[in-house]
């Protein structure tokens, strides 16, 4: 669908209402009207179909097996045990008996059919969770450093992020009328949208809050990133980064991934003003003609960073202060038990590609249900698709450990290679309509194929960051990985190499459109050289750059590599 068509749909939607009520009530098809397929994204859902069944249904002269993905808005991925049980029940009753933790700390339900879509939405809201603005050309789910219970400063960070998420919600009542049966009032369909305006944003907008020295949110991959400045356990404010983004288009030199620019420091008091100024600047300056060039990163590159920063400061009425020093050490999760400053404990469990389901080998859904039934602590989703069981007293650890062992919830933590423990993948096939190749379903197989090579060179316990994406949109943030597979066609991938373990450097195309056999053949000699010639503590991506095997990619984003002067 063209940019002009989507802009027309948004502008004529009566503030995201469209004909959704009529589409939902139509019993003759499992699909929505075409324009409503665009609008339902703003309500937190995508219309999809099971691509594994497409050809067979076509032969039977049946319409595709339409279904819906629903995504929650859960800033920072924080939920209570009771909410977990309610989401578990929804997955079992309405979806495909699984919960999917996303790379933005949300949950996704897959396989919901149209006639049960409204009931599913109502059940999610009954859990005091919503899906509003989880998709669409608005601010998406706000990422936050994974565990706000580690310290008072982390708690303040989460509070700021949750406040900003609420501030940037659309003002329309369409969501509540369509899904929760709120009665229409005078002026419905004409509500003022003070932040978004009648056409909302040109494209999606992503925000992340990071707490050095850990960059688990990959803050520089966001349109807007906030890097916490914490001194003596007090959150003073944030370094502000703008213009990150992962999406690109295969073979199109006018599109590229980008890491964000640090533009200065703000105090906590200025968070809402600066965020509003940045979002409205993108609203007014972003490209609404060519959708593939509509993200904030292109607005910055087209108009110039100085121009955009000047506009932001003028709108906010704020002069940005010089950025404060910071250090990122890694962008992964710390598995196992960690003690917080309040002497409560937090257990991080690795989930392969974020999927929580019951299988013969790993009854993960049942296991987390058993922990939630204890009614203690909290659940925290991480930006690396893992789960933290947080806020556990010392006396409760043994009970948690027993359930972890009983249900094999630490299977991911015990994966045979460090690479497998830290790897990420997007959903891709069979539900994502954009997928060109497998990702989530392929990740375990690829890990198995790579394991003998890692063991051969003594690298099984060496952290190497692998990410797989089914298409170049990059939902698994593959362009920051040391090794990335980006889907090109069924069974074929672009092999990207040379990112780092701090989320600060993009990788480079190494081999294009190759098969698994070719991927493994390309990686083996490089891993062998890495084993022989790496420096102490040197990551794989850093090694590839130091030895000249990989250079920075040719697109303009690397004008914006993070300045070493800010690395304290």
Swiss-Prot record:
GO-annotated molecular function: 4 iron, 4 sulfur cluster binding; heme binding; metal ion binding; NADP binding; sulfite reductase (ferredoxin) activity; sulfite reductase (NADPH) activity
Superkingdom field: Bacteria
SUPFAM superfamilies: Nitrite and sulphite reductase 4Fe-4S domain-like (SSF56014), Nitrite/Sulfite reductase N-terminal domain-like (SSF55124)
Ranges annotated as spanning the membrane: none
A GO cellular-component term linked to this record: sulfite reductase complex (NADPH)
UniProt-annotated binding residues for [4Fe-4S] cluster: 426, 432, 471, 475
Cofactor remark: Binds 1 siroheme per subunit. Binds 1 [4Fe-4S] cluster per subunit.
Binding site for siroheme: 475
GO BP, one annotated term: cysteine biosynthetic process
Pathway the protein takes part in: Sulfur metabolism; hydrogen sulfide biosynthesis; hydrogen sulfide from sulfite (NADPH route): step 1/1
HAMAP family associated with the record: CysI
NCBIfam families in UniProt: CysI, PRK13504.1
Protein name (database record): Sulfite reductase [NADPH] hemoprotein beta-component
UniProt source species: Xylella fastidiosa (strain 9a5c)
Gene for this chain: cysI
